[in-house]
UniProtKB/Swiss-Prot annotation:
Region Disordered, residue ranges: 1-52
Biased composition (Polar residues): 10-23
Protein role: Bet counteracts the innate antiretroviral activity of APOBEC3 family defense factors by inhibiting their incorporation into virions. May be implicated in the establishment and/or maintenance of viral persistance. Bet is required for viral replication.
GO cellular component terms attached to this protein's record: extracellular region; host cell cytoplasm; host cell nucleus
Full protein name: Protein Bet
Keyword annotations: Host cytoplasm, Host nucleus, Host-virus interaction, Secreted
Encoding gene, per UniProt annotation: bet
Length: 482
């Protein structure tokens, strides 16, 4: 693993008492309350009336940090995990150039995407508040604080289950290859993966490698075979899972930040290639398995989601769009987590169905090239060196094929109870059941019945009840509330 020239521990939080919470980085002291604030700037000409435009309205989200801390007064406070920006700057943290930061992973850098609502174009990945990467919970692309707190909250939940195996975040002052000083910490968060956080004076960098998992993604062969991408573990470093996010701005900045999304490939720094098989076994020592039995959302993400999204043969805009579809489906259920909340979804079956084929398809490629709704004319669907671009059968570009519209994604063995209930309602007629191996039964709640499922007497009663023409048949067996 890479090591820098100088390392100095500055944030061993066991001896620090007066640390602020992350809420003080992005909002007032009464964290937990949300408000809409207008960014007011000094008027150059006081005679001209002040006009507020849509871009001048800054929406800042506050999360209940103190409420979470008050629920567990016997444990370490969340505020004891992060040093303050003033403390980091006091350690002579320096400014850095964006080009220098990108040059550290230039050999494994697959794409760079500039995010932010002020950028030109109508790319949905740019206009969205959600970071367009497949992650267990939505992350923010507007500010580093909600993203950092979501990761910290998830790590803290694991600490509450087994305090003896978790340590507080320890930030160290280091020097990068260009000679600039920065603050850094690194830890493993299941099921997300290995997380590295770096603080410069004018940048905050988050690097995540989802291929590092000593419990769900360890290879049992030799060390030489482990470095072979063709015979490695189930999930390897790919642009669809491994990423680096660069937030541009001061550490104490409260306004929205400019963001750069870098997708990383095989062999990137602070990734799975830096860990040998003995290192992964060492990470397991003294730790309890964070994954439960089948039906656990964390287990489902570690196996089903990562295996179903590991292919990185598509272009970066396509991966961004598919990731947004993934998070859009999760956030459509209001009981699932939002930005800044490090909780797992109830299930990822619907999100995987919205993500679509991980290696792409002819139908999706034709739709992508015809609609051009991503704001980039001439953008490719497959990245260079990806899948075969030839597609002999060209379907209608404005709709999916009959097979895509009428089939249901098969149910995975890692599906959660929420996924099984949703799949049963979508795939089976009303009243039909699915009985699992453990004896739990799930009944279909479908409220719409097609004519292919009705007898002549039922059709006649439907006609007498005043419904429309009963002989209008959609021809689909997937009609339902979803």
């Amino acid at each position: 693993m890479d090591s820098y020239e100088k390392e100095e521990s500055v944030a061993s939080t066991s001896g620090i008492q007066d640390l602020q919470t992350l809420s003080e980085l992005v909002g007032p002291e009464n964290a937990g309350e949300g408000e809409l604030t207008i960014a007011e700037e000094p008027e150059e000409n006081p005679r001209r009336p002040r006009r507020y435009t849509k871009r001048e309205v800054k929406c800042v989200s506050y999360h209940a940090y103190k409420e979470i801390e008050d629920k567990h007064p016997q444990h370490i406070k969340l505020q004891d995990w992060i040093p303050t920006p003033e403390e980091m700057i006091a350690q002579k943290v320096q400014n850095q150039d964006l080009g220098t930061i990108l040059s550290f992973d230039v050999t494994c850098l697959k794409s760079i995407t500039s995010l932010g609502r002020n950028d030109p174009g109508d790319d949905p990945s740019i206009m969205s508040h959600v970071l367009p990467v497949v992650t267990p919970w939505p992350m923010s692309q507007d500010h580093y604080a909600p993203t950092l707190f979501g990761i910290l909250d998830r790590y803290y939940q694991g600490y509450l289950k087994s305090p003896a195996t978790y340590q507080t975040w320890k930030f160290t002052c280091q020097v990068d290859p260009s000679g600039k000083r920065f603050m850094e910490t690194q830890f493993w968060v299941p099921p997300l993966g290995q997380v590295n956080i770096q603080f410069y004076k004018n940048y905050q960098i988050l690097t995540c490698c989802q291929a590092v998992d000593p419990f769900a993604n360890i290879f049992h062969g030799t060390d030489e075979e482990m470095f072979d991408i063709d015979s490695g573990p189930d999930v390897w470093c790919s642009p669809s899972l491994c990423f680096k996010v660069i937030y541009e701005g001061a550490m104490g900045q409260k306004q929205e930040q400019k963001t750069w999304l870098c997708r990383l490939g095989h062999g990137h720094r602070m990734g799975a290639c830096d860990y040998r098989k003995v290192d992964l076994y060492a990470m397991r020592q003294g730790k309890e398995n964070p994954y439960g039995d089948r039906g656990d959302a964390a287990l489902q993400y570690a196996y089903q989601v990562k295996r179903g999204c590991k292919a990185g043969c598509l272009a970066s805009p396509v991966l961004n769009y598919k990731a947004l579809q993934f998070h859009r489906t999760i956030m459509a259920d209001f009981t699932n987590p939002r930005i800044g909340e490090g909780h797992l979804a109830h299930g990822y079956q619907a999100a995987m169905e919205a993500y679509g084929p991980q290696r792409g398809s002819n139908e999706e490629r034709v739709w992508w090239n015809v609609t051009r709704n991503q704001g980039k004319q001439g953008g490719e669907y497959y990245r260079e060196g990806g899948e075969e671009p030839h597609y002999p059968n060209t379907p209608a570009p404005h709709r999916r094929t009959w097979d895509e519209r009428h089939k249901v994604l098969k149910l995975s063995s890692f599906a959660t109870p929420s996924d099984i209930q949703r799949w049963t309602t979508k795939a089976l007629p009303y009243g039909w059941k699915v009985v699992t191996e453990s004896g739990n039964d799930y009944t279909s709640r479908r409220k719409i019945r097609t004519l292919t499922e009705m007898t002549q007497d039922e059709i006649r009663k439907r006609w007498e009840s005043g419904y429309c023409d009963p002989f209008i048949d959609s021809g689909s067996d997937s009609d339902g509330p979803f």
